[in-house]
Structures are given as C-alpha cells and as structure tokens.
Amino acid sequence: EQPCASAEELVEVRRQLMRNGLFVRVAADESIRKVEDPYRVADLQAADVAVVKPAPLGGVRRVLEVAQHLRERHMDITVASALDTSIGINMGLAAVAALPQIYDDEDIDVTPAAAGLATGSLFEEDVTAPRRLHDGHLRAEILAPEPDRLSSLAAPANRRDWWFERLRESW
C-alpha cells in the first residue's frame, strides 16, 4: 500500500529502504488514482507496483492504457476496486481479464494480480446476491442488479435529487 501522499515522497521511501539494505516492494495507489498524471509514478521510478482502480481511472480501457505504460517501465500491476458494489466489481474483473499476459526475465508466465476486488463484503446490502470468495478467488461472472433489491435500497427522493444536482454541477 502507498505509505505516503506524493510520488516524490515515494521516491524518498524507496531511496531510504535501499540505503538501509531493505528490499521491500513499494506500491503506489493514491499517486495513480488521485492525480492528473498517473504516469508520473513510473517516470520517477517511485514504486514497484501500481494499484489501478477502474472506476476512478475512467473504466477498463483507461486501466489498460495506464497499465501498458506502467508495465513498459517495469512496474507490476494490481487491479483493485474503490469500495465498489458487486456491479462495480464487474469492471475490475473485466480489467483483470483484459490485461495481457506478461513474462518475466526467465520467460515464466506472470499473471496480473487482482487484489482488493472483494469489497462488496464490506456492505450490509448490495443490489445483487453477494459475491462469494472461492479459495481466495472471485468468479468472473457478470452480475446484474436485481429489481427487488434496487427497489428496497433506493435512496429517498430528496437524496436522489441531491445526487443528480451534484452530478449536473460537476458536469
């Protein structure tokens, strides 16, 4: 996980770790998700692993673009969710499935990591039946919202209107 706020601070963390003989892989999360330039982390060699989240980055295609750039700079990719429901996790599963296989220096298959996609279990309720982990894995099945669950979990009209207004203002 990212231990500090900026890419520059990550560079310093890596420098201090190496200086002290500690070979610990550093992951960048917020420095990719919350900045205008998600490539800066790689350009500065600030991390070993990039945690990419489809929703904040703008979808599966954007994840694939960012992942390609970062991999070309020798960063490993981990796909995670941003506290998504089962519907949002569909996008994370699609992103992992779409990432190309890579091979390490010894021509060994390296499977893209999918960590942090089981965030649906953090919700009391969801708009689908709960996704279940099977031996530490999520099934790559596309879940659709269930009408009864959508109805029972719908926000009150005033809250819905507030969200629509917020979207209009930000658009």
Regions found by a protein language model. Give the residues of each.
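Flexible C-terminal active-site loop/helix
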Residues: 82-171
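Catalytic core of soluble alpha/beta enzymes
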Residues: 1-91, 123-133
